[in-house]
Amino acid sequence: MTSPASGVPEPADPKARLAELVERLAAADAAYYRDDAPIMDDAAYDALRREAESLRAAHPDLAAALDQVGAAPSGAFGKVRHRLPMLSLDNVFEPADFVEFCASIRRFLGLGAAPLAFVAEPKIDGLSISLTYENRRFVRGATRGDGTEGEDVTENLRTLRELPATLPDDAPDFIEIRGEVYMTKTDFITLNQGQARQFANPRNAAAGSLRQLDPAVTASRRLSLFAYARGAASQAVGETHWDYLAILRRWGFPVNPLAERVSEAGAEPFQRSIGERRAGLDYDIDGVVYKIDDLALQERLGFAGRAPRWAVAWKFPAERALTTLLGIDIQVGRTGALTPRARLDPVNVGGVLVSHATLHNEDEIARKDVRIGDTVELQRAGDVIPQILRALPERRPADSVPFVFPDHCPVCGALAIRPAGEVVRRCTGGLSCPAQVVERLIHFCSRLAFDIEGMGEKTVQEFHGLGWLESPADIFTLRDREAAIAALEGWGEVSARKLIAAIDARRRISLARFIYALGIRRIGEQNAKLLARHYSSYAVWRRQMEEAGVIGSDARLELGSISGIGPSIAEELAGFFAEPHNRDLLDRLVPMLTIEDEVAAAGGALAGKTIVFTGTLESLTRPEAKARAEALGARVTESVSKKTDFVVVGADAGSKAAKAASLGVTVLSEAEFRSLAGLPPG
């Protein structure tokens, strides 16, 4: 008997033959994908694969065997900490926005009207990755993740034929190269033709393909790569970004051929040109990235929050569409805010199927006179949440009525009040409101907080409904319920064990993440980092926050003087710690964790020091001096106190210099600060 699919005679023992084929194919996969040393050519591999598939089709009882073919799955992806953070970019949408971006660079550097030179590159709509080479060999690849820590996808990246396995002898001993993994439109169409469940767009397809547990699946998806940025390196590579791209090309990396050097005045024409060519490209782009070309200027500009000061993404005009508003749902957030969300008849906007949009607040609904049943114009710009631009009154149903915003919480029924001067209405139910409890728990487990795998919205809601989760501390007692979790529908012992392991893996956390995870109003990721950097340890932070509850106390004044915090945020923090139930939560939670101290940048004279700048500096702008000090591990505050280590004085220093002298605080000249900061004489 001959197998019709493969043309190979039916073996006497199909099970034994299939086992042999599985073993040979697995060895070939491992050699090709992991060792970069193929042991058979493509034709031989394909013939064995076809024979194995034919045997499986003829013998359904053996169907599971071939599923093992491929390099051994990596299991859950490990975590990789980036030596230099992989940050996102700020966006601009109009020429005036770009002009202001350029002006902000000049202000920061004190450049006056000096012209700026950029490198412009199409912004690929894919998945950002970091490629690490040690001793000129590719050793590790990671996704961006939260910018600080990503997922280890090394074995999957090895399957990209465009990725150099080694670098030339002139490359540094250590270097991180950043780039974008994407899928061409052609390959996306081909992939979807063979998929039972289709991907919505090439970006989703690329992300899903790179995160396959089996590298063989990734290899079959035909992913592509563009390299475009630098991470950490043991030595400098080029003096300009344009030089760097040329070096990457010489090393064998694919670099976008549409990248160009442009002047400040040339940015707008280049933006128009790429926009006109966009539809004809075989890959999706959603704008153009403009980077300061001079790497020395990039170094001086540094970073602000989650984005570099030296680069910006100029996004293409927002995509728009018309659809029907089916309903307005009121969501209750972790701080009690009632937020309206539009429920829409699903519509494709820029390649993404949109079924919900933001309505911001009750004033916005009234201003736009948006009503249920209206035909509305929807806009989606880049990664921004879709929003309703306007309603079309001429298409409005005859029985339509204005939307009435609720004055009671839709979840717990408590009164929802709107404080004077605020646009948000808030539920007064506090911790008695199930929605607030659930949202706080979801926030606690989220990616930028404790990042607990498996503790998503659905799981949190289920466990809260069972009475297992009322506060974050309860998460770390779920080990006692492992058997009960395993018994739940859709779980089982393996899933329960993985969840408990994921929770245990997050018992150690940085101070900044811990502060953010608490969900204190107005304490986002950046403010949490500011607080962690300033107070260094959990014990000090908590003690100071409790003391800051007394208006006029040294602790309150110090908190309000932290650059970026200010009095209003200080009031929110003091209010949080004034609540007994919040202190009780911390008393339960903290003993179950290891909260890492914030480690100041090592080795410098400014590390861990508190600095105040006053007066006009000559060789540095105030923002540049502040950024330099913070990059070296210093804490910059606005007012002088006994805890201040240095006051840096410029011209017309005023009262702060006098107060420093009266308190015995060290006063530094600008030249002395430059020396401590490792800068050459100005």
UniProtKB/Swiss-Prot annotation:
Its EC number is 6.5.1.2. Keywords: DNA damage, DNA repair, DNA replication, Ligase, Magnesium, Manganese, Metal-binding, NAD, Zinc. It catalyses: NAD(+) + (deoxyribonucleotide)n-3'-hydroxyl + 5'-phospho-(deoxyribonucleotide)m = (deoxyribonucleotide)n+m + AMP + beta-nicotinamide D-nucleotide. One of its GO terms (molecular function) is metal ion binding. One of its GO terms (biological process) is DNA replication. The active site is at residue 123. Disulfide bonds: none annotated. Pfam families: BRCT, DNA_ligase_aden, DNA_ligase_OB, DNA_ligase_ZBD, HHH_2. It comes from the Bacteria. Its cofactor is Mg(2+); Mn(2+). NAD(+) binds at residues 42-46, 88-89, 121, 144, 180, 291, 315. GO terms for cellular component: cytosol. Zn(2+) binds at residues 409, 412, 427, 433. The keyword DNA damage applies. Residues 601-682 form the BRCT domain. The keyword Manganese applies. Belongs to the NAD-dependent DNA ligase family. LigA subfamily. DNA ligase that catalyzes the formation of phosphodiester linkages between 5'-phosphoryl and 3'-hydroxyl groups in double-stranded DNA using NAD as a coenzyme and as the energy source for the reaction. It is essential for DNA replication and repair of damaged DNA. This is DNA ligase. The gene is ligA.
